[in-house]
Regions:
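Short glycine-rich, low-complexity segments
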Residues: 1-22, 47-48, 53-60
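SH3/SH3-like beta-barrel fold
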Residues: 14, 37-43
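Short, conserved beta-turn/loop elements at beta-strand boundaries and strand-helix junctions
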Residues: 32-37, 56
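Structural motif
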Residues: 31, 43-46
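Short beta-strand-centered aromatic/proline hotspots
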Residues: 24-32
């Protein structure tokens, strides 16, 4: 639900699970790929299922 309305270039803070536990990352949203269930920041792709929370921090 929180992914709706996000646009490329938005500044977001994503809390997600990886191999080592939960971590947060703030960055510019590169793209949302619903077909692949991926959210991409500049240097990382995060699976939708791993996202615990996402906050919009600024608009492009």
């Amino acid at each position: 639900k929180k992914l709706e309305g996000l646009k490329r270039g938005d500044l977001v803070r994503v809390t997600y699970y990886d191999t080592y536990g939960y971590r947060s990352r703030t960055g510019i949203l590169d793209e949302v790929l619903p077909a692949f269930k991926l959210l991409k920041l500049k240097d990382i792709a995060i699976d939708f299922d791993d996202i615990q929370d996402i906050e919009l921090r600024g608009r492009a």
